[in-house]
């Protein structure tokens, strides 16, 4: 699927203009006063993962995501229902999203360091339901009640920690009348996690490799042991190299210095697309004496349309399990990674990833 760059840029520009238009049209005092998403429709009572019982339309055709995780998950199972996005897609992402979504307005997100949810713009788009998806926070029930009270729109939470994710896809399949595809996605997730658990259990503790997961331009922001952003490392049977530091579940992670990194001296280094890979590849002296660099065990994490490991940590981690397992333990996780990527992209994005596209994604992400 090759679409012109000009077309993509125009689509993104249109989305920005539409978002601004909706922002100002929604700034009035009565932005949602005349909108009742339950008026004249059949409803059901849905119990969300906060334990809240919420009346929602029986047939859902218009949804607003509360943030980046919700956007990612909904984009895989019901993109046609989206009336807006938490953030506009980049030009690199557009090929993997339905063209309809390219010009949707943006609402921002409710949680996280970039929390900026624009209630007025969201209400102006008139969704039937606001869906929040992700890990459960201490104040989640109160937060969902607050959004629902402020917008007048039914708001539900669906939990997607890795063990809850299959159930989340089954729930979404039910809500959107897409039980068959929801079950396929749920089963794929279960099979992936089970495969990794079985192989991880076969690796002796003494043989477990340590992995450093660096983010950002310096490579010294990292996802430490215990962070949800780095849980794929543990799932495949490896160890997070960064221990004994503060842990952050935010995308920026934990900042370390080069002295600490040399003390950790990981067996494998993986960095995000915006990271330090090219600097390491060009022989930057501050990195050259690390064992992983001397042995050629440093890699770039594929990141289109989303980082395969986290950022945000969602269903993208499922592909990350296949990739990181194959990279760190190729004898145990023995399969064709190009074929695995194609399988995932077809199921979750309905996208026919070509051999050349997959190989390009993996160019800096395969065993040297």
What is the role of each PLM region?
Residues 1-59:
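Short, low-complexity disordered leader/linker segments with a strong preference
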Residues 38, 53, 142-221, 250, ...:
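Extracytoplasmic substrate-binding proteins
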Residues 39, 44-49, 57-92:
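Extracytoplasmic strand-loop-helix segments at the start of, or within, the mature domains
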Residues 49-51, 105-120, 246-258:
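Short helix-initiation/N-cap motifs at beta->coil->alpha
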Residues 62-66, 83-86, 129-133, 154-159, ...:
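Structural recognition of the beta-strand scaffold that forms the well-ordered cores
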Residues 70-125, 129-137, 241:
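A short, structured surface patch at a secondary-structure boundary
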Residues 111, 222-252:
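Alpha-helical, coiled-coil/dimerization segments enriched in small aliphatic residues
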Residues 125, 243, 247-300:
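A contiguous binding-surface segment within folded domains or other stable secondary-structure elements
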